[in-house]
């Protein structure tokens, strides 16, 4: 099971890195993201400092995103409390490119996305986070270390 999860995540990251112009260099600090969570609270990416974090750009209407969600749930369950050289634990910071709050919330519940860091400005492709990270397609994932 562990090998399947690692293999799948490797495929996801490889394809997405090849298909996009990432707006930062590997090893450089990432730009802060602060967006509203599903409970209307502000959540910052920097709140997760010290952990390995998967920044996940997705949307409820995106079929490939929804097909990818079960694998992210498996990875989260397996790695959430693990110790890593480059981080203490694993978290997912999900950034939705939805415009419809109800559809976004329903997708989180239906897909059983158990992590707590779900954020969106409900601006779709006009999202500041998507622009900052030069996201041109979804699903898009960026893995960052503890720093």
Q: For the regions a protein language model found, what residue spans apply to each?
A:
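N-terminal "domain-start" segment that seeds a small globular fold
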Residues: 20-46
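Conserved helix-turn-beta segment immediately C-terminal to the redox Cys motif
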Residues: 69-94
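Short, internal strand/loop/helix patches
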Residues: 36, 98, 105-146
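Bacterial Sec-dependent N-terminal signal peptides
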Residues: 1-25
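Short amphipathic alpha-helix with an adjacent loop that forms part of the alpha/beta core around
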Residues: 44-48, 130-133
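Short active-site neighborhood of thiol/selenol oxidoreductases, capturing the structured segment around
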Residues: 45-62
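Conserved redox-active cysteine motifs that mediate thiol-disulfide chemistry
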Residues: 57-74
